[in-house]
UniProtKB/Swiss-Prot annotation:
Domain TRAM: 401-467
Example of a GO biological process term: tRNA modification
All residue ranges annotated as the Radical SAM core domain in the record: 161-398
SUPFAM superfamilies from the UniProt entry: Radical SAM enzymes
Cofactor: [4Fe-4S] cluster
Entries under PROSITE patterns matching the protein: MTTASE_N, MTTASE_RADICAL, RADICAL_SAM, TRAM
Family: Belongs to the methylthiotransferase family. RimO subfamily.
Lineage: Bacteria, Pseudomonadati, Pseudomonadota, Gammaproteobacteria, Alteromonadales
Keyword annotations: 4Fe-4S, Cytoplasm, Iron, Iron-sulfur, Metal-binding, S-adenosyl-L-methionine, Transferase
Matches recorded under Pfam families: Radical_SAM (PF04055), TRAM_2 (PF18693), UPF0004 (PF00919)
Name listed for the protein in its UniProt record: Ribosomal protein uS12 methylthiotransferase RimO
Keyword Cytoplasm: yes
Underlying gene: rimO
Cellular component annotations (GO), alphabetically ordered: cytosol
Length: 472
């Protein structure tokens, strides 16, 4: 089941935009108890939105895509960087102006005073993953329908804000690291891993519902299970170790693509690479490295042995030659010198990463990094950002060119009058590139097709469909 949420009028400034769907559920019952919903932020926040929406539907509420038709509006906010805070406050403002009855939840909700200073008329405010509190507040202002005969129509997977063929699977909350640029632990707490059996149950339901790609997310995915003290959980009567490698191995047996996001560079990440080489999980590693200067990494409270990171990348590629590595970096961190920045550029040239995102340092309210060194001017940050992206564009083009002439499985995301648009194992939805298959207008979203790569640039691939039995 998909539910239509609506998109605020302001332009999004985040990598993951305001989530909006094209088609509303056709079996939603008209109850007069209508809730509007705005979901902002990252995929982890998206999962929180899906859980709230699922419970709203179970409770008999109708989710509407119009401010005018809503009895109340929920805004699930992001509060990680200043731009996200501004966007969230703008979304709350718009909801108040257009509707008047607003409940705020999500990461920014952990800073109630900040919201109240700008928007004192908000009805209620809760922090992140406060599902029960959100529902309690909804019941207070919009009475729960006495009976809804259609709740049995809600699938076991619940409400999803993603296309039917892929879904995010959140395996834990919080983080035990204390990176100086990040305030996530203060918003979402320390690491709290879900039981392995619960995760695998959810994954099984997703696959049985037609999901072809599971995107594993959390604040610190590779730390999964560290808080469990080595305790074993059970699934289908079998013991399952609660660590990321054991979990990934079980997920890989379910017959869907499994893509891992937000991998912190712990030593045991090495154990995941053989699973990728075996084809159990996608050979794709999203591992935010943040910088390469040992001095800056120390100030960030991040792992600082860049030589070991380069050795690891080489080792991983030897084990799994198809491995695609995505990473993110920060330029303009407080105290960053030109020498530090050159070390970062040199690292890029040596590491030859496949996909890279770059962020200009933003002063996050409450982040330790704001006060540990002199702030970098906006002009310098902008200059370094463009120099960084120029270097990486050439590297990305080189890395993508290796696929030309190969035949790959392509998961179709969209089809228009020009053809189909999909992704290979090398491309995560919404953040990486795409594969364009011109002329194939008969394909449908969710199809997995074989296609030969004919062309590439620094971001995307172009391909043509071939017979299913065609090999590389």
């Amino acid at each position: 089941m998909t539910v239509e949420t609506f998109k605020p009028k302001q332009t999004t400034t985040l990598d993951i935009p305001v989530k909006t769907l094209e088609a509303a559920s056709t079996n939603a019952v008209t109850t007069g108890n209508r809730i509007g919903f705005v979901s902002l932020g990252c995929p982890k926040n998206l999962v929180d939105s899906e859980r709230i929406l699922t419970q709203l539907r179970i409770d008999g509420y109708e989710v509407t895509n119009s401010y005018d038709n809503a009895d109340l509006v929920i805004v699930n906010t992001c509060g990680f960087i200043d731009a996200a805070v501004e966007e969230s406050l703008d979304a709350v403002r718009e909801a108040l102006e257009e509707n008047g009855k607003v409940i705020v939840t999500g990461c920014l909700g952990a800073k109630e005073n900040q919201i109240r200073e700008v928007h004192p008329d908000v009805l209620e405010i809760t922090g992140p993953h406060s599902y029960e509190a959100v529902l309690k507040h909804v019941h207070k202002y919009v009475p729960k329908p006495e009976h809804n005969p259609f709740t049995s129509l809600i699938p076991q997977t619940g409400v999803k804000l993603t296309p039917k063929h892929y879904a995010y699977l959140k395996i834990s909350e919080g983080c035990d690291n204390r990176c100086t640029f990040c305030i996530i632990p203060s918003l979402r707490g320390d690491l709290d891993s879900r039981p392995a059996g619960s995760i695998l149950d959810e994954a099984k339901r997703l696959v049985e519902s037609g999901v072809q790609e599971i995107l594993v997310v959390s604040q610190d995915t590779s730390a999964y299970g560290k808080d469990k003290g080595g305790r074993t959980d059970f699934w289908n009567g079998m013991p399952v170790k609660q660590d990321i490698t054991s979990l990934a191995r079980q997920l890989g047996k379910m017959g869907a693509w499994v893509r891992l996001h937000y991998i912190y560079p712990y030593p045991w990440v090495d154990d995941l690479i053989p699973l990728m080489a075996e084809g159990l999980i996608l050979p794709y590693l999203d591992i935010p490295m943040q910088h390469a200067s040992p001095r800056i990494l120390k100030m960030m409270k991040r792992p600082g042995r860049v030589d070991r990171q380069l050795e690891a990348i080489q080792r991983w590629r030897e084990i799994c030659p198809d491995l695609v590595i995505r990473s993110t970096f920060i330029v303009g961190f407080p105290g960053e010198t030109e020498e530090d920045f050159q070390i970062l550029l040199d690292f890029l040239k040596e590491a030859r990463l496949d996909r890279v995102g770059c962020f200009k340092y933003s002063e996050v309210d409450g982040a330790v990094a704001n006060t540990i060194a002199e702030l970098i001017s906006e002009d310098v940050k902008e200059d370094r950002y463009h120099r960084f992206m120029e270097v990486q564009a050439e590297i990305s083009a080189e890395r993508l060119a290796r696929f030309v002439g190969r035949t790959l499985d392509i998961l179709i995301d969209d089809v228009d009058e020009e053809g189909a648009i999909g992704r290979s194992f090398a491309d995560a939805p919404e953040i990486d590139g795409m594969v364009f298959i011109n002329g194939e207008t008969e394909l449908e979203p969710g199809m997995l097709v074989r296609a030969r790569i004919t062309h590439s640039d620094e971001h995307d691939l172009w391909a043509e469909v071939v017979d299913a039995d065609t090999q590389d």
